[in-house]
C-alpha cells in the first residue's frame, strides 16, 4: 500500500479517536488500533516513513513514536 494512503488512514483514525481526549491519550488509542488491526506489512511501511514528515498530524506522530517504542513491527 502506498505510504501517502497509510498516512491519510492514520490521520483519519487519529481524528476519529481524538475528541474529548488529550493528544497523548488519543495517540495511545491509535497505537492500540494499529497494533490490533493493521497487518505487519502496513505497520512496517508506516514506520519506515520519517517521523518528521509534515503530513502526519500531531496525534499520529505521537502514536508512531509510541509504536516504535513497542518494537513489535
Predicted regions and their residues:
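N-terminal acidic leader/helix
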Residues: 1-24
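Charge-dense, helix-prone N-terminal extensions
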Residues: 4, 59-62, 72
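Surface/interface-facing alpha-helical segments and adjacent flexible terminal/loop regions used
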Residues: 4-5, 10, 27, 42-44, ...
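Amphipathic alpha-helical segments within well-ordered protein domains
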Residues: 14, 31, 46-47
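Short amphipathic alpha-helical interface segments
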Residues: 25-32
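Short alpha-helix boundary/capping elements
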Residues: 35-42
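Short, charged early-sequence alpha-helical segments and their helix-coil boundaries
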Residues: 42-67
Amino acid at each position: 500500500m502506498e505510504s501517502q494512503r497509510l498516512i491519510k488512514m492514520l490521520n483519519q483514525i487519529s481524528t476519529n479517536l481524538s475528541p474529548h481526549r488529550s493528544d497523548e491519550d488519543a495517540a495511545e488509542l491509535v497505537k492500540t488500533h494499529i497494533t490490533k488491526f493493521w497487518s505487519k506489512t502496513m505497520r512496517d511501511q508506516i514506520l519506515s516513513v520519517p517521523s518528521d514528515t509534515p503530513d502526519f498530524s500531531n496525534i499520529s506522530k505521537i502514536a508512531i513514536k509510541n509504536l516504535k517504542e513497542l518494537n513489535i513491527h
